[in-house]
């Protein structure tokens, strides 16, 4: 039996896992033409929704995550565990899988 989640706030990542919502590409051109879903490229950029407490390093000490809630991050093309909450899609990544923080 599948559990139906009401909100992404109910997902609390464990250890070094990071919950990310992928930023959607524009479906409309600057001139106002709507693009079909198949022609819209999937962006490799996301926003951090929640962060686990961190993983343990080789010395057994807790290593803090390298990102914070609200950060824009560059995502790998593959990987992560996909989660659907209502119509929204989220992904869980390990801290070391995220490629970069986007500062703009």
Curated annotation (Swiss-Prot):
Family matches, as InterPro entries: Chaperonin_GroES (IPR020818), Chaperonin_GroES_sf (IPR037124), Chaprnonin_Cpn10_CS (IPR018369), GroES-like_sf (IPR011032)
Modified residues (Phosphoserine): 81
GO BP, sorted A to Z: chaperone cofactor-dependent protein refolding; protein folding; protein import into mitochondrial matrix
Domain of life per record: Eukaryota
Keyword ATP-binding: no
Single annotated GO MF: protein-folding chaperone binding
A Pfam family: Cpn10
CC per GO annotation: mitochondrial matrix; mitochondrion
Localization terms from the record: Mitochondrion matrix
Keywords: Chaperone, Mitochondrion, Phosphoprotein
Quaternary state and interactors: Homohexamer.
PANTHER family, per database record: 10 KDA HEAT SHOCK PROTEIN, 10 KDA HEAT SHOCK PROTEIN, MITOCHONDRIAL
HAMAP family associated with the record: CH10
Task of the protein: Eukaryotic CPN10 homolog which is essential for mitochondrial protein biogenesis, together with CPN60. Binds to CPN60 in the presence of Mg-ATP and suppresses the ATPase activity of the latter.
Family classification: Belongs to the GroES chaperonin family.
Protein name as it appears in the record: 10 kDa heat shock protein, mitochondrial
Natural source organism: Schizosaccharomyces pombe (strain 972 / ATCC 24843)
Name of encoding gene: hsp10
């Amino acid at each position: 039996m599948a559990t139906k989640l009401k909100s992404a706030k109910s997902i609390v990542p464990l250890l070094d896992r990071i919950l990310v919502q992928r930023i959607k590409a524009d479906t409309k051109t600057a001139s106002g033409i709507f693009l079909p879903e198949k022609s819209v490229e999937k962006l490799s950029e996301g926003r951090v929704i929640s962060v686990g407490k961190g993983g343990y390093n080789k010395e057994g000490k807790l290593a803090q995550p390298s990102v914070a809630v609200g950060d824009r991050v560059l995502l790998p093309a593959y990987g992560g565990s996909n989660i659907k909450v209502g119509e929204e899609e989220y992904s869980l990544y390990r801290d070391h899988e995220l490629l970069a923080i986007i500062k703009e």
